[in-house]
């Protein structure tokens, strides 16, 4: 009997070792945490069915109360029986997967035992189904509460399952005396082994899941602590100053060798190891970062070659690079570097991903706040334009002069002035208007300007018929046309032409305003739309405001694009196509 106990202990040990190895694989951890899902149920069924079949074929042959052999068996003599760990696998399948898993595993286990044969082999098919039902329905009770059976309860059910098998051997045996002799020999070792094995199996699962839960709790705490300390910085945007403050906090609180943050083209900050050549304000030098910006997906590197730094003395050997997203576009990257590859763990990767998500949200919130401010600024400027004494008095004086000369034209201009004020007010209160309404606004403005300066400029429209209902931000064309009138022609009084072009395809609207003026100075061209540029006729703040609004609403693809030569300037932008019908 003691020899049987030792041999069974070996079989149980094999199953437990395999279970321990599986529970260290992330896929199986996830499966155990989602065991109520159908996909997990089928995976558990296949896993425990393989365990059950293995248990049957690695059993210990017993005949006339003696151990005959412990080799792998495919067939038994008609008078022989077998001691194995089959009941353990069926019971565990039920406790973990519930009745669905247990019944299928029980049938598979019973049929494979029936195939091996031996004395009263059909008995084990019957007992397998009973054991599956009992353990399966108890497992179902715990699944409904999203818990697992305790180790003690597992040990009790394990012993009970083996006791049921002993009872089935006695009840369904053809030779009661032989059955009783068999039960006397195998009952105690098998009940003890099944009870102990079930308890250990459950303890491995429970301890692994508890450790996983504790790890997640620590990660969550770390993420919240870092997020809480970095919260104020990214709300102001992805700048060198905000990036450096955030990187220093992360380096202090996390087990990493270096932290870097970039925008799409440049290193904003790099603190920690390798700071001598990973320098802020310089272009991105690692191939890994360039790949993340290109694909928008997290990337890992586990060697210097994979990082792609061209400095031979770089001490960085491992890295995690996560994209920072704004409105589903890559705005930059968050990079964790390691001088020891073993520090680059799965938990660090998950923590990095969580931080990147939070930082991306903060950047989006910051941009939304900036857009709100820009819209308010645009509204204020628009309202100011309505009561701008210079513009207002010039228009009124022009109309007054025309009253005596051409009263009908004066009446039309007065209506245009009213239309201009009304359109300005409506545009200031809406995020988008149709291209048709924007053109009406432009016409009203041009009518007033042409009345003041007859024949000074000519406006030519090239508008696709499908464009009229496409939605655009207010004042886009008006600002571009007004900019051309004020800055393009300087003191030239004739042959001044402005072309307004709108082209529409299925995905985007292309707006272009082109003039034949004197062009923009080469030293000022890169600054136009990026910042205020002082000149004799203004500061260019309207173009800067418009450009920032377009980028904030639609991304960098919608930014104003300037081309200028000595024979004219072309300003264009590409806006995603949305019609008024789609927005209603």
UniProtKB/Swiss-Prot annotation:
Keywords in alphabetical order: ATP-binding, Cell membrane, Kinase, Membrane, Nucleotide-binding, Phosphoprotein, Transferase, Transmembrane, Transmembrane helix, Two-component regulatory system
**Annotated InterPro entries:** Bact_2-comp_sensor_kinase, GAF, GAF-like_dom_sf, HATPase_C_sf, Sig_transdc_His_kin_internal, Sig_transdc_His_kinase_LytS_TM
Q: Which residues carry this modification: Phosphohistidine?
A: 390
Segments passing through the bilayer: 2-22, 42-62, 87-107, 114-134, 152-172, 185-205
What kind of membrane protein is this, topologically? Answer: Multi-pass membrane protein
Sorted alphabetically, the Gene Ontology cellular component annotations on this record are:
plasma membrane
| Compartments reported by the entry | Cell membrane
The molecular function terms of the Gene Ontology recorded here are:
ATP binding; phosphorelay sensor kinase activity
Name one matching Pfam family.
HATPase_c
In short, the EC number is: 2.7.13.3
Quote the catalytic activity from the record: ATP + protein L-histidine = ADP + protein N-phospho-L-histidine
Its main localization is: membrane
Q: Which GO terms describe its biological process?
A: cell wall organization
Which domain of life does this protein belong to?
Bacteria
Residues in domain Histidine kinase? 379-461
Entry keyword Membrane: yes
Q: Specify whether Membrane is a keyword of the entry.
A: yes
Q: What does this protein do?
A: Member of the two-component regulatory system LytR/LytS that probably regulates genes involved in cell wall metabolism.
Q: Name the PANTHER family for this protein.
A: SENSOR HISTIDINE KINASE YPDA
Protein name stated in the entry: Sensor protein LytS
Which species? Staphylococcus haemolyticus (strain JCSC1435)
What taxonomic lineage is listed for the species of origin?
A: Bacteria, Bacillati, Bacillota, Bacilli, Bacillales
Q: Which gene encodes it?
A: lytS
């Amino acid at each position: 009997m003691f020899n049987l106990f030792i041999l069974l202990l070996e079989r149980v040990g094999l199953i437990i070792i395999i279970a321990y190895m599986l529970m260290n694989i992330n896929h199986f951890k996830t499966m155990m945490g989602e065991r109520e899902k159908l996909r997990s149920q089928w995976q558990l069924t296949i896993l425990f069915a393989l365990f059950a079949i293995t248990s049957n074929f690695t059993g210990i042959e017993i005949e006339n109360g003696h151990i005959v052999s412990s080799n792998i068996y495919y067939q038994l003599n008609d008078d022989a029986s077998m001691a194995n760990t089959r009941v353990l696998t069926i019971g565990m399948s039920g406790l973990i997967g519930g009745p669905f898993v247990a019944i299928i595993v029980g049938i598979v286990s019973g049929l494979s035992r029936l195939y091996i044969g031996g004395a009263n082999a059909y008995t084990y098919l019957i007992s397998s189904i009973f054991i599956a039902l009992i353990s399966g329905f108890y497992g179902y009770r715990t699944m409904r509460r999203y818990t697992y059976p305790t180790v003690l309860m597992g040990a009790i059910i394990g012993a009970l399952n083996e006791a049921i098998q002993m009872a089935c051997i006695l009840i369904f045996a053809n030779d009661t005396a032989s059955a009783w002799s068999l039960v006397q020999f195998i009952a105690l070792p098998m009940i003890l082994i099944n009870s102990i094995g079930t308890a250990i199996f459950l303890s491995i699962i429970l301890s692994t899941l508890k450790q996983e839960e504790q790890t997640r709790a620590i990660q969550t705490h770390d993420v919240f602590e870092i997020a809480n300390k970095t919260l104020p910085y990214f709300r102001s945007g992805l700048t060198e100053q905000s990036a450096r403050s955030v990187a220093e906090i992360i380096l202090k609180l996390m087990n990493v060798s270096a932290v870097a943050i970039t925008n799409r083209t440049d290193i904003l900050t790099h603190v920690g190891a390798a700071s001598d050549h990973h320098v802020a304000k310089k272009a991105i030098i690692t191939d890994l970062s360039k790949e993340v910006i290109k694909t928008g997906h997290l990337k890992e590197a586990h060697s210097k070659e994979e990082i792609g730094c061209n400095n031979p003395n770089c001490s960085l050997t491992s890295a995690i690079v996560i994209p920072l997203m704004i409105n589903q576009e890559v705005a930059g990257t968050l990079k964790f570097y390691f001088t020891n590859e073993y520090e680059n763990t799965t938990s660090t990767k998950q923590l990095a991903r969580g931080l990147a998500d939070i930082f991306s949200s903060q950047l989006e919130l910051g941009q939304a706040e900036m857009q709100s401010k820009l819209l308010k600024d645009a509204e204020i400027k628009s309202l100011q334009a309505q009561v701008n004494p210079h513009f207002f008095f010039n228009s009124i004086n022009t109309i007054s002069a025309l009253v005596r000369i051409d009263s009908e034209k004066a009446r039309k201009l007065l209506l245009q002035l009213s239309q201009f004020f009304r359109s300005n007010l409506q545009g200031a209160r809406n995020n988008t208007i149709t291209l048709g309404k924007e053109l009406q606004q432009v016409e009203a403005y041009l009518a007033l300007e042409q009345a003041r300066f007859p024949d000074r400029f000519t406006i030519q429209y090239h508008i696709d018929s499908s464009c009229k209902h496409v939605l655009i931000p207010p004042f886009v064309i008006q600002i571009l046309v007004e900019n051309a009138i004020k800055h393009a022609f300087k003191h030239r009084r004739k042959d001044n032409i402005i072309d307004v072009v709108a082209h529409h395809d299925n995905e985007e609207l292309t707006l272009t305003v082109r003039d034949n003026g004197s062009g923009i100075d080469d030293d000022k061209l890169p600054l136009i739309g990026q910042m205020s540029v002082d000149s004799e006729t203004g500061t260019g703040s309207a173009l800067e405001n418009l450009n920032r609004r377009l980028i904030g609403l639609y991304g960098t693809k919608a930014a104003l694009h300037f081309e200028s030569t000595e024979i004219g300037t072309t300003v264009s932008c590409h806006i995603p196509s949305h019609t008024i019908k789609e927005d209603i």
